Amino acid sequence: MPRYLEGWIKDVVENAKRRPYVSRSREKPVLQIIPRIRAVKGAGLNPVIAEYKRKSPSGFSEDRDPISYAKSMEQGGAVAISVITENTVFGGSYEYLERIARNVKIPLLMKDFVVSENQVDTAYDLGADFVLLIVRILTERELSGLLEYVRSYGMEALVEVHDREDLDIALRSGASLIGVNSRDLFSLTIQKEMAMKLLEQIPSTVTKVAESGIESAEEIRLLREKGADAFLIGSSLMRNPDKIKEFVQG
């Protein structure tokens, strides 16, 4: 059994299992996120994955048009866009992903509580290029199986961890792209020091993404010093999209 599957997380996962597969005819090739992160980093810029979300359990709430937001992030230099598709707690939808995929030319992350191959099928069909897999809501066997299934489409998985045990599982499963979430999904608290220590423990062969609570270019610089290769930023950019250039160039 996964170590953390209770309370609101359990409800969200159960809902994810019930959501039907959405079939579409994919209209674009899969874009590879890891080489793009390396290219942006190599150019002396910060690879920012800009997130589109409507709300979250932490109390965040913001209503922006998905297309105009995504285009502004692309124009501002974001390496990719994360689209939350979880529909009960985060106010996301598959429609947002599909619409954004038709309007931008940078990689898209389907950010959801992915627990089934049907969700991966949906991600591919709607135009995602990489998919979030959260270690804490999956068994190690499930994680390995879903990682292999995601890659069978030519996509990549952003494997999210929060502590050393999560990281060990992610590494054993063969993750190439690991996201360190400073927010504990269960308590919703931000633990930045713990996240920074975890970033330092990830092998250099793995591409590392710092997630949650990033509010300034100074924080990005500090996370970069700790080994982060890319930065997933949601609330700060949703509140003030103009920050994207500062974050990319800072």
UniProtKB/Swiss-Prot annotation:
The keyword Amino-acid biosynthesis applies. GO terms for biological process: L-tryptophan biosynthetic process. Keywords: Amino-acid biosynthesis, Aromatic amino acid biosynthesis, Decarboxylase, Lyase, Tryptophan biosynthesis. Pathway: Amino-acid biosynthesis; L-tryptophan biosynthesis; L-tryptophan from chorismate: step 4/5. Signal peptide: none annotated. It holds the Pfam family IGPS. InterPro entries: Aldolase_TIM, Indole-3-glycerol_P_synth, Indole-3-glycerol_P_synth_dom, RibuloseP-bd_barrel. Its EC number is 4.1.1.48. Belongs to the TrpC family. HAMAP family: IGPS_A (MF_00134_A). NCBIfam families: PRK00278.2-1. This is Indole-3-glycerol phosphate synthase. The gene is trpC.
